């Protein structure tokens, strides 16, 4: 099996796992997501984009009163996986989340592995998890919460688009980093 077909099969499996929280989406052969960037770390050559799918925000069938949310982490760094996918439950009234499951797709081997997740209810500490909670609980405030709509597309298209974004960001981030380094050397920065 060629690498491209292996990748496409694994991306499809990952998308299916991501869609497992939404039965309507899971029935589609190539589900279309409504993608939003909820956070990005902005580290040159090590960018990570945290992308949530609005179609995954549905009432949980597992926990009464909770809302499901799926977040994909797309990595730029070659030594990292291509992406990780986490399915979370959010309790909007208490401001708590818990991880249901997670999967990772390795960049070169195109293999999928299951990630260990802490499945107890917790107050989010990491910023991206806080953003995931806001994404699920305040859909009308996504733009106000510094989230950017990416558009409606298939999962593989979203991954490819973000990889292209990393490619376009690289020279801009390198120039910015170079200017910061020069400022530091000249002690112009306070």
PLM regions: where:
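Bacterial N-terminal signal peptides that target proteins for export
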Residues: 2-11
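N-terminal signal peptide c-region/cleavage motif recognized by signal peptidases
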Residues: 19-23
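Cleavable N-terminal signal peptides
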Residues: 13-14, 24
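N-terminal secretory-pathway/extracellular module detecting exported/lumenal segments
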Residues: 26-87, 91-190
């Amino acid at each position: 099996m060629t690498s491209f077909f292996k990748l496409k099969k694994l991306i499809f499996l990952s998308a299916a796992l991501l869609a497992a929280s939404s039965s309507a989406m899971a029935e589609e052969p190539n589900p279309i997501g409504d993608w939003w960037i909820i956070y990005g770390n902005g580290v040159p050559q090590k960018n990570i984009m945290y992308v949530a799918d609005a179609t995954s925000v549905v009432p949980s069938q597992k926990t009464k009163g909770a809302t499901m949310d799926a977040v994909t982490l797309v990595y730029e760094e070659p030594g990292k996986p291509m992406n990780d996918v986490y399915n979370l439950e959010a309790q909007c009234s208490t401001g708590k989340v818990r991880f249901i499951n997670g999967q990772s797709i390795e960049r070169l081997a195109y293999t999928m592995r299951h990630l260990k997740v802490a499945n107890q209810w917790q107050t989010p500490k990491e910023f991206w998890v806080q953003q995931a909670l806001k994404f699920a609980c305040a859909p009308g405030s996504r733009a106000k919460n510094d989230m950017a709509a990416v558009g409606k597309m298939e999962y593989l298209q979203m991954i490819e688009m973000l990889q292209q974004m990393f490619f376009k960001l690289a020279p801009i981030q390198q120039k910015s980093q170079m200017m910061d380094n020069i400022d530091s050397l000249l002690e112009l920065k306070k």
